[in-house]
């Protein structure tokens, strides 16, 4: 069966969610890349449900985003949603609750492969976040992840992605996963986990390696981009010129 390449970042995000699911709880986190990729405890979580909700919204732009999220979220309400999000799902008139948790960044993979420009990425990511995560850090995290995926999907080399994210989102990406393993405490905020997830992606050699690095660093999720394997990276010295056509 041929898979539409637009869906590959979504598949990668779901894969990362399933693999990382058994390491989310305190006491289950590890500091090594040597672990079984799947076992009997591996499962999809709320992040998969919301990733699919955003993808559905992008495919059906005439439908209301909140209605789509409520429909899928209520159908799968017991797959790991946090307390505040469950309250949002159960409310007859759901309102954003000023969250800066990384849930806003976990659900945006489809935006990165659907948008045509960085401006569109920023707009769609904000729109997807503010239904719940209307704190500036919650919006920023969603936009940063969606932008990183967009740039990767459009064949930008990692050095350009790192440069763009640092300059436009003020994230410190000048660390290694080894540093993070030694010093990082689990943090579910956007500002405390999105940079670490992007670092795992930047250090990785492929999708599996990215997931293993993210898990070993105890980052709450793995930023996965999964695009056609025959990607042709641009020369390293044309980052700024290349961005101009993508704005």
Language-model segments: residues:
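Structured, active/binding-site neighborhoods that engage oxygen-rich ligands
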Residues: 1-247
């Amino acid at each position: 069966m041929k898979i539409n390449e637009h869906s590959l970042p979504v598949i990668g995000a779901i894969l990362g969610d399933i693999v990382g699911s058994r390491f989310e709880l305190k006491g289950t986190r590890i500091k090594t890349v040597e672990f079984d990729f799947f076992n009997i405890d591996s499962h999809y979580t709320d992040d998969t449900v919301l990733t699919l909700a955003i993808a559905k919204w992008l495919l059906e732009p005439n439908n209301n985003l909140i209605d789509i999220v409520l429909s899928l979220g209520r159908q799968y309400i017991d797959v790991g949603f946090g307390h505040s999000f469950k309250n949002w799902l159960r409310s007859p008139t759901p309102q954003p609750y000023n969250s800066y948790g990384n849930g806003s960044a976990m659900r945006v993979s489809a935006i990165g492969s659907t948008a045509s420009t960085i401006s569109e990425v920023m707009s769609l990511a904000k729109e997807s976040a503010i239904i719940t995560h209307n704190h500036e850090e919650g919006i920023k995290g969603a936009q940063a992840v969606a932008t990183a995926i967009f740039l990767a999907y459009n064949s930008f080399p990692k050095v350009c992605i790192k440069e763009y994210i640092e300059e436009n989102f003020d994230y410190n990406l000048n660390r290694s996963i080894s540093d993070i393993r030694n010093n990082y405490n689990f943090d579910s905020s956007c500002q405390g986990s999105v940079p670490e997830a992007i670092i795992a992606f930047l250090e990785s050699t492929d999708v599996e390696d990215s997931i293993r690095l993210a898990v070993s660093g105890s980052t709450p999720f793995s930023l996965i981009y999964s695009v056609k394997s025959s990607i042709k990276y641009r020369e390293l010295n044309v980052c700024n010129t290349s961005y101009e056509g993508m704005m």
